[in-house]
Amino acid sequence: MHAADMDALLFMSEREFTYFAGFQSNFWQSPTRPWFLILPAEGKPIAVIPSIGKNALSISWIDDVRIWTSPNPEDEGISLLSDTLKGLSKRHGRVGVPMGSETHLRMPANDVVKLKSALGHVDMVDATAILRNLRMVKSDWEIAKHKYICRLVSDAYENFGNIAKSGMSEREILAAHRLDVLSRGADSVPYIVATAAQDGTDDAIRFPNDRPLVDGDVLFIDTGAEIDG
């Protein structure tokens, strides 16, 4: 951050919030309220969140939590966020935000415009490279978690022959496989696909259907499971 002349990094997506704050919640399924996490170039992280998340975030390691009363459609945290960022951006006047591939800003486009206007001479600049380079280096703890979840799903695949039978539908097979993965210790299975067709399938993304599998079908299944975020 110092080399890139950035006073702070601003995150607002579930992945970055979970990675840096260690906080997990199904509340991310609701797009009505944004959550913001700021990493200053110096000092502890700062969370700027709606009031509904105050108690839940208190169990994380983030101890500087600033809240606004929400819902408040006219100002969902923009004033509080801009004031916080301006207070941190007195040296370079630059705040880094992931803007590159595989990133997104989890806030209304109108609020992005409002935030940039409220920041005045503080510029929002792309911090994708900083984030990507950081996450490319895995700690021993992260590697252990990857090994654990990969082994868990591999064991579920080994057991797949005991689950998938001719006459079952893609939907039934998918549900049984998901339950098997969860029963082995996964926290969630947010991505799972099962498609089948005679002599193979060229569709690897659609929802499962209710057609019973018959002899000659080739079943494709893809599983994305999580443990500790």
Positions of the model-derived regions?
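A composition/biophysics-driven feature that prefers long, compositionally simple stretches
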Residues: M1-L152
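Short alpha-helical functional segments enriched in proximate histidine and acidic residues
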Residues: A4, A156, D180-R184
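Short catalytic-site patches enriched in acidic/histidine residues
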Residues: F17-Q29, D126-N133, V137, M168-G229
